[in-house]
A protein has these predicted regions:
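A detector for small-residue-rich transmembrane helices and their helix-helix packing motifs
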Residues: 1-158
């Protein structure tokens, strides 16, 4: 989860972590956030392994753990607006987080349902791992949340 396949792989993952990670870390605290990230990454890896049991190709990258962070963001901040970069253009646009995450999930689903998500077709992206991490983040974030924050004792009930 700490090794990447090149600079673009690293930059894209860190960009997504920068967009979604700070708010999730604020709700969890640093130690719980790290545990959550690692846990989602583990679930993502197991999902990829389940979908590609005969693969001998190692998986690298932070995508599964970051997908988990995105899954938690989907429920915790659905109406937030995020600023994203329009690829290959020096343009940044503000979009609803739920729209960005919805499109991201649709792309992942398209890849796995069309057979493009397996390593047997020469694909070097762990699409099943992305979905596994996202689903883990969506459904397993609650135990990692801090119950009480110093900001006025606000309680989080989701």
């Amino acid at each position: 989860m700490f090794l990447h396949g090149g600079w673009l792989h690293l930059i894209f993952n860190m960009w997504l972590l920068w967009i979604f990670g700070d708010n999730i870390e604020d709700r969890m605290g640093g130690v719980r956030f790290l545990a959550f990230y690692l846990f989602c990454g583990l679930i993502a890896g197991l999902t990829h392994l389940y979908a590609n049991p005969l693969s001998t190709i190692p998986t690298i990258g932070a995508s599964g753990g970051i997908a988990g962070i995105m899954g938690a963001y989907f429920f915790l901040f659905p109406y937030a607006r995020i600023v994203i970069w329009v690829l290959f253009l020096p343009i940044f646009v503000e979009v609803p987080a739920i729209a960005f995450l919805g499109i991201w999930v649709i792309i992942q689903l398209y890849k796995v349902t069309t057979g493009m998500g397996t390593v047997s077709d020469g694909n070097d992206v762990a699409w099943f791992g992305h979905l596994g991490g996202f689903l883990a983040g969506m459904f397993l974030y609650r135990p990692f949340l801090l119950e009480d924050r110093a900001r006025g004792g606000e309680r989080y009930r989701f």
